[in-house]
Amino acid sequence: MCGIFGIVSNEVVSSKNLDILAHHAEQRGRDSSGLYFSNEDRFSLYRAPCSISKLLRKVNTDSSKFIMGHSRLITNGLSDNQPVYQNSVCVIHNGIVVNHD
């Protein structure tokens, strides 16, 4: 199981709104988490073997207007932790993605 959330705003995302969304996502899994967000003109990606609440305490999202988050029960190990970023594309999904040639 996993929880997914995202915020896109013209204003900086409030920590209160982010905490509410993270709390709801955490109901679906607490073993690993990930965040992808913008601080001004720079994007940051974090993945961790802890709850989304713990991860949020370790990163600075104070100037973010765009945040995607993922919280899950580990089913395939930490190597499958999300978000996944490759070739300028960031993906968070609910399911299993199998690589294709």
Question: Over which residues does each language-model region extend?
Answer:
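N-terminal glutamine amidotransferase
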Residues: 1-100
